[in-house]
């Protein structure tokens, strides 16, 4: 059995503790539960693995084109699709013959599982991403300018194999864009000034769009990053000095919280999607 490292003290979650493995194995090895089997021993404690199986396919391609000696243009695309299976499985029955898992809604009275069987949860998610960008750079002896713009779209799906419906939940695609630009001006051979600005949108992660029960957040806000940098640089044969001011802001952060109100569809729990957190 699990015991606190210091006798008489109580602990929660990740805390100092010891486990009497011999006692657990002895208990599992002589535990007949006639509700499930009259000949095999039921394990009340086991070891389990958390598994995450992922298959990802994609294509990244870009094209460089020199418009002139001073101007270079680059265009690119980024396509990726991923399927991820999330589950837990029985790793060791610790002396018993089987374990009873109650997580599958398709077996409300308990499901007999053995070594390697899925327990606790079993779901599959997909992430489909496509992006494109255009970038240009203009470079002369006195001035250097660059700019880029990009757009991307991402879509999520979720399927819970432990639910009765086993419905494929699909969230609407989310579109984001970003723009960045900057430049450097050489005042003379040693002194230069520079500035950079940027605006980037980041889509919410899957967990902030589709929750564990398959509920979908409609029109979630993209997270937004803005940045500004201005500065100067001086270089000589003896010394190099660089100074700059940098500011970045992160707005519309997304969070998902469960609260107990008694007003949710289940009668006791609501899922609240918090957007616009600054």
Where are the predicted features?
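Signature of Gram-negative outer-membrane beta-barrel scaffolds
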Residues: 46, 72-188, 203-205, 209-213
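Outer-membrane beta-barrel domain signature, strongest for Gram-negative TonB-dependent receptors
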Residues: 1-82, 240-242
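Transmembrane beta-strands of outer-membrane beta-barrel proteins
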Residues: 1, 74-78, 146-150, 196-198, ...
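Outer-membrane beta-barrel channels and translocator barrels
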Residues: 68-70, 140-143, 186-190, 225, ...
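Surface-exposed extracellular loop regions of Gram-negative outer-membrane beta-barrel proteins
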Residues: 153-160, 171, 185-229, 240, ...
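Surface-exposed loop/turn segments flanking beta-strands in extracellular/periplasmic regions
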Residues: 5, 9, 17, 21-39, ...
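Residues that define the transmembrane beta-barrel architecture of outer-membrane proteins
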Residues: 53-57, 126-130, 173-177, 224-228, ...
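Membrane-embedded beta-strands of outer-membrane beta-barrel proteins
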Residues: 59-61, 132-134, 179-181, 218, ...
């Amino acid at each position: 059995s699990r015991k606190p490292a210091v006798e008489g003290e109580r602990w929660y979650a990740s805390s100092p503790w010891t486990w009497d493995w011999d006692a657990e194995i002895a208990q599992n090895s002589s535990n007949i539960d006639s509700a499930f089997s009259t000949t095999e021993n039921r394990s009340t404690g086991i070891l389990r693995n958390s598994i995450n199986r992922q298959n990802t396919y994609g294509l990244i391609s870009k094209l460089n084109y020199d418009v002139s000696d001073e101007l270079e243009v680059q265009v690119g695309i980024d396509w990726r699709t991923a399927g991820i299976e999330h589950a837990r499985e029985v790793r060791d029955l610790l002396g018993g013959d089987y374990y009873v898992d109650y997580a599958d809604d398709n077996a409300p009275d308990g499901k007999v599982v053995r070594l390697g069987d899925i327990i606790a949860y079993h779901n599959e998610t997909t992430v489909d991403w496509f992006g494109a960008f255009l970038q240009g750079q203009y470079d002369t002896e006195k001035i250097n300018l660059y700019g880029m713009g990009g757009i991307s779209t991402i879509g999520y799906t979720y399927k819970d194999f432990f639910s009765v419906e086993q419905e494929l939940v699909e969230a609407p695609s989310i579109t984001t864009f970003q723009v960045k630009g900057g430049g450097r001006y050489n005042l003379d051979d040693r002194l230069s000034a520079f500035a950079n600005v940027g605006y980037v949108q980041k889509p919410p992660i899957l967990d902030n769009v589709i929750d564990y029960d398959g509920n979908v957040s409609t029109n979630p806000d993209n997270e937004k990053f803005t940045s500004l940098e201005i500065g100067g640089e001086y270089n000589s044969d003896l010394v190099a000095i660089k100074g700059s001011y940098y500011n970045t802001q992160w707005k519309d952060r997304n969070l998902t919280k469960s609260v107990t109100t008694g007003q949710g569809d289940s009668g006791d729990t609501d899922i609240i999607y918090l957007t616009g957190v600054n």
